[in-house]
Amino acid sequence: MSQVQSGILPEHCRAAIWIEANVKGEVDALRAASKTFADKLATFEAKFPDAHLGAVVAFGNNTWRALSGGVGAEELKDFPGYGKGLAPTTQFDVLIHILSLRHDVNFSVAQAAMEAFGDCIEVKEEIHGFRWVEERDLSGFVDGTENPAGEETRREVAVIKDGVDAGGSYVFVQRWEHNLKQLNRMSVHDQEMVIGRTKEANEEIDGDERPETSHLTRVDLKEDGKGLKIVRQSLPYGTASGTHGLYFCAYCARLHNIEQQLLSMFGDTDGKRDAMLRFTKPVTGGYYFAPSLDKLMAL
């Protein structure tokens, strides 16, 4: 069985760092850099076992095609953007995702990543996420309630089972900027109708009582009676005085599941848009492929 990269399956991490970058020059330098980083990561994982450290190196479409010789990751493509610009694309070449129970350890690993990749990449965005009170989003609503729980269930959803991509996963990242002043102008009832869950108790509002535009309705999708599940590794980010919001991060064995949720949220299926857009907006978006650790080490 191919070994999964260690940042895909962990639950309830308290902190994360996401680094998106473009390749400088030829992609061949990424091969040695990826292996060097994986070796450094293993050292940190052994040194800080209680941190439950994990990390992922993933690649955008053009970069993965160049690294793999065009083999595998058949669903992978550049993030096209959705909703006629409501969900913009900021596709980059490389994603590094680091997560654990300790921000200090994450930061040390991020420094190691910068040493490993060096001049072969140009960092375009670096975001530090944190777990907020009761695993709530900064909106005050619990985030990720329907996230698959347990390693085997999460593996079933997030990891490709067999074939040339066995042990790999598709990744989607999208940074949302919240306008909490706008949110707080709404009554709690109106906020709950936007999300589709009660705010304090985190109870699902019945489908016939919540609007078709509620967030829950837009993303709770089924095909042939089966839910289109994803594994979320999202966290709040930002500063109290400035920009803040949610860094959305999802892993799935099928890019299809992620894309169907996006099409539904941004009105590309039935013209109805997620009511969350009343108080928050996405400002980035990228699709990536995370190969198995075995394949990453053998690039």
Swiss-Prot record:
GO molecular function: heme binding; metal ion binding; peroxidase activity
Recorded family membership: Belongs to the DyP-type peroxidase family.
Cofactor(s) recorded in Swiss-Prot or TrEMBL: heme b
Main localisation: cytoplasm
Gene Ontology annotations for the cellular component aspect, listed alphabetically: cytoplasm; cytosol
Annotated keywords: Cytoplasm, Heme, Iron, Metal-binding, Oxidoreductase, Peroxidase
InterPro entries per UniProt: Dimeric_a/b-barrel, Dyp_perox_C, Dyp_perox_N, Dyp_peroxidase
Organism: Escherichia coli (strain K12)
Cofactor detail note: Binds 1 heme b (iron(II)-protoporphyrin IX) group non-covalently.
Name used for this protein in its record: Dye-decolorizing peroxidase YfeX
PANTHER family the UniProt entry points to: DEFERROCHELATASE/PEROXIDASE, DYP-TYPE PEROXIDASE FAMILY PROTEIN
Stated role: Has both general peroxidase activity and dye-decolorizing activity. Can catalyze the oxidation of both protoporphyrinogen IX and coproporphyrinogen III to their corresponding porphyrins. Also efficiently decolorizes the dyes alizarin red and Cibacron blue F3GA.
Entry-linked PROSITE patterns: DYP_PEROXIDASE
Protein residues bound to heme: 215
Active-site residues (renumbered): 143 (proton acceptor)
Superkingdom assignment: Bacteria
Subcellular location: Cytoplasm
Record EC number: 1.11.1.-
Phylogenetic lineage: Bacteria, Pseudomonadati, Pseudomonadota, Gammaproteobacteria, Enterobacterales
